[in-house]
Design a protein with these regions (language model features):
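Double-stranded RNA-binding/processing signature
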Residues: 1-182
Length: 182
């Protein structure tokens, strides 16, 4: 498998992998390797671990708020845009292993690719050193966003805000038309 110098990335993460192959797998986009040696399985695991860590954090830090509010707060932290911003901060695009064709199409700069790879790295950290260490790393990486989190603020996605606004004005709920992205 292709090797990259990942020491700069590990420094940005504040974490040194015991099994460096886990990090390489987490960085390997499916365009580079269609076999099982790509980051999709680690992304699946990382997504679950990230949601669990943030859920636990919110549960402990905001003990008096209800489940719906915690769900909205978690969604404001764990989403493609948020993870994309975190990935840009650590220059993750410089480390993603992709096919040359995908790189020419600027695939290493796409939100989905960066946020998915970020989740894969969380999954790799979990497999490398377990939940406790992963929790410390995630909380450190999200520290700035967590500090700015305010339980009094309403955390709603734009669709929910639109529906509630229309409902308050006694309008019928909107009808949504979805299109397929290419």
């Amino acid at each position: 498998m292709f090797e990259k110098d990942t020491s700069k990335l590990e420094k940005e993460l504040g974490f040194r992998f015991e099994d460096s192959l886990l990090l390489i797998e987490a960085l390997t986009h499916k365009s580079f390797s269609s076999s099982e040696e790509n980051n999709q399985r680690l992304e699946f695991l990382g997504d679950s671990i990230l949601n669990t860590i943030i859920s636990e954090y919110l549960f402990n830090e905001f003990g008096k708020i209800n489940e719906g509010k915690m769900t909205s707060m978690r969604a404001s932290l764990v989403n493609e845009n948020s993870l994309y911003e975190l990935a840009k901060k650590i220059k993750l695009n410089e480390f993603i292993i992709m096919s040359e064709e995908e790189i020419l199409r600027k695939g290493n700069l796409r939100k989905a690719a960066l946020s998915d790879t970020y989740e894969a790295i969380i999954g790799a950290i979990f497999l490398d050193q377990g939940y406790k260490k992963t929790k410390i790393i995630v909380i450190n990486l999200l520290n700035e966003k967590l500090k700015n989190l305010n339980s009094e603020k309403t955390f709603k996605d734009p669709k929910s805000e639109l529906q509630e606004s229309l409902q308050s004005m006694k309008f019928k709920p909107p009808k949504y038309i979805t299109s397929i992205k290419s």
